Amino acid sequence: MISPAQDPYASRTDRSSAIIARQDPVVYGEGKFADALSADQVQSYERDGFLLLENLFSDEEVAALLAEVERMTRDPAIVRREEAITEPGSNAVRSIFMVHVLSPILGRLVRDPRLANAARQILGAEVYVHQSRANMKPGFKGKEFYWHSDFETWHVEDGMPSMRALSCSVLLTDNNEANGPLMLVPGSHRQFISCVGETPRDHYKQSLKKQEYGVPDPVSLQLLAEQGGISTMTGKAGSVVFFDCNTMHGSNSNISPWPRANVFMVYNSMENTLNPPKYGLNPRPEHIATRQAFKAVRPLDSLKLVER
């Protein structure tokens, strides 16, 4: 087991918080493994730690995806499953995990070349699905999600070795300034924030509702925001946000009348598969972090997502 002293991205140990320079590339293989993105788009992703592509999916595709997500949130058989996470203090569904397995159309979405080939291009390798989920923020009562780096959690709680993973968020509703859109700190992917506090047992049961461990300290957050600012990912339904696993991000609550729904697909390099979790922690369940049943994503041959 690697000790905190040997871990280049040590976090949640008995030491104080720290800002650590990233030791991994952002774009692997010079972005030449696939050709879904232009050179300018790859450069923008490498610089900022994220990339917004507007109107990547058609209205017909978005309607089919949104209808499927809404069906899943109403299906008692799915809502009772451990993959379904409710909002703090209510029975409203906040997230559904492993959606690429639970739903045929979302299983096709994760293989859509517009997503999968972009991930393969940036990560410079074949990829697999580390995690997939649908996130909902109903109007008036959708809760916030505090600032965090996904990699901090995936490294500590899942044993992900390196920063060679990315998320893509497919917007299924219009995301505007009022309904709690994703916020990202440009350039924050270049620095790893080591967090304080020992991870409780089965932390995931609480953190998926409200994360309290593995969150950065206010001083580090302020420094990152002063250096890079904060970008709000607003866009029409059908747009997609790709963002690096270490980009600092969060979202406000939704007290507007307009619901927000997104589907997240997390791609990890086949050369970056999980080790045991850090510091003696137990592995999180398979539906949160794919450890056993993984295989390389084979992109679909066409852009035909919706089957007639």
UniProtKB/Swiss-Prot annotation:
Its cofactor is Fe(2+). L-ectoine binds at residue 131. It catalyses: L-ectoine + 2-oxoglutarate + O2 = 5-hydroxyectoine + succinate + CO2. 2-oxoglutarate binds at residue 137. Keywords: Dioxygenase, Iron, Metal-binding, Oxidoreductase. Binds 1 Fe(2+) ion. The record marks 154 as: Important for ectoine stabilization. The keyword Oxidoreductase applies. Disulfide bonds: none annotated. InterPro entries: EctD, Phytyl_CoA_dOase-like. Fe cation binds at residues 148, 150, 249. Its EC number is 1.14.11.55. One of its GO terms (molecular function) is 2-oxoglutarate-dependent dioxygenase activity. One of its GO terms (biological process) is ectoine catabolic process. Belongs to the PhyH family. EctD subfamily. Homodimer. Involved in the biosynthesis of 5-hydroxyectoine, called compatible solute, which helps organisms to survive extreme osmotic stress by acting as a highly soluble organic osmolyte. Catalyzes the 2-oxoglutarate-dependent selective hydroxylation of L-ectoine to yield (4S,5S)-5-hydroxyectoine. This is Ectoine dioxygenase.
